[in-house]
Amino acid sequence: EMPFTEDDFDPQLEQALELMPELLGDERAEIRYAINGLLSLTPDGYPILGETPEVKGLWSAAAVWIKEGPGTARAVAEWMTHGNPEIDLGHSDIARFHPHQKTRAHVKARTSESFIKTYGIVHPGEQYESNRNIRLAPMHASERELGAVFYETAGWERPFWYESNAGLVEKFGDACMPRENEWDSRWWSPIINAEHLQMRETAGLVDLSAFVVFDVIGPQALAAVQNIIVAQADVKIGRVVYTPVLDETGGFRSDLTVMRLAHDHFRVVTGGAHGMADKKWFSDRMPDGAVVVDLTSSW
């Protein structure tokens, strides 16, 4: 907490008086307590909550603003004592970050950009401009030549549509569901829907380089995987299983793909945005005789 400076607060107080003149203009209204606090910002704008992946039993409740303090404290306490909070905190899970998202350079770049947008009107699809191109797929250059429009997911540049497929919009017409509202049409293109329709008619290749990949290996690998996923894990070697992952209360945590590579060897492929949290979920539930090996950066 820093000393309160009225000069910094006066412009905001004048704006508040315009919005609530009857309340703040009342002669009985007064400032009981005033602080000049620092804003805690994170690379993606969400708090940093939960047990750290690096140290068992070390919990974080960081980047929590005053107005969210009581609710956050309750949720984290539930998480610590019961294993799951009453509300979903997946977007704020400290385990969500990839190693390249925790570097000092990345954190500084993103939080500096976030500060400017903190009280702005930010479109849900709006992309960060800072520190881009830190993770590129092997076919990135070819995708760019095809007119790919890249969005970032967990540091990876992923094509959301290809301008070279613009002709498909005319082919499918209204089936592309064009968006007439200007706000809805920001950070979007009807080419997205046209590409989906074309793939349903023919075939296509989807770049999944940004997905998280980790193996579960050991004599207890089958028991470990079966304890975590909903689908049957005891399948023939070479089979691929698409399955939900539930928590202890039956709540939905994730959907992912599991491949059985050997009797005691399973490979898990899951989304890039939540994949590191999925890896921690598996790691926390490994019995003696099974280990998790992260292969995300091995390709």
Model-inferred region functions:
Residues 1-52, 196-246:
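Well-ordered, non-transmembrane segments within structured domains
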Residues 98-299:
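Glycine/proline-enriched, intrinsically flexible loops and inter-domain linkers
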